[in-house]
């Protein structure tokens, strides 16, 4: 699932009333009244040759958790299914019979959908790979389709 990011991020474009480009936790705090949903990349960042790597998953979780902390310090209550997904996968060995594919897009999209529908604002931090992540694209498309403000930390492409 690919999006036309240049169209979404265009100043004065069709989505400019909903999309804030170059946002940050302070701006999110000024515009958020409710739960923020932090959409961060995962699947493409945590694999090599279609094999899930816990070391990469841990790094992705830390990078996304850093953004949760930055929002927390700005007094924004935020959830990040990427962090919950990563940490659940890190714990798989502690639960008998737990077999979940960390790279199963459809499973994780369905699992995270109930969190997404509670969001009052969608935040996409500038974590490497955000533009190519199918889950981030799904989240942003859903937000735009449902009139939920989108805050992109990345600036306009040069």
Predicted feature locations:
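Conserved catalytic or regulatory cores that recognize and/or transform ribose-phosphate-containing ligands
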Residues: 1-158
């Amino acid at each position: 699932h690919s999006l036309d990011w240049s169209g979404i991020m265009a100043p004065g474009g069709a989505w400019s009333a909903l999309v804030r480009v170059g946002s940050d936790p302070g701006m999110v705090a000024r515009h958020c009244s409710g739960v923020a949903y932090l959409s961060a990349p995962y699947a493409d960042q945590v694999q090599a040759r279609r094999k899930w790597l816990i070391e990469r998953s841990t790094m992705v979780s830390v990078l996304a958790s850093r953004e949760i902390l930055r929002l927390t310090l700005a007094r924004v209550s935020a959830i990040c299914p990427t962090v919950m997904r990563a940490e659940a996968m890190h714990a798989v060995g502690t639960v008998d019979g737990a077999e979940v594919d960390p790279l199963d897009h459809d499973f994780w999209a369905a699992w995270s959908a109930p969190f997404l529908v509670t969001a009052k604002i969608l935040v996409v931090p500038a974590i490497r790979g955000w533009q190519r992540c199918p889950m981030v694209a799904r989240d942003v498309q859903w937000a735009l389709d449902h009139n939920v403000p989108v805050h992109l930390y990345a600036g306009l492409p040069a």
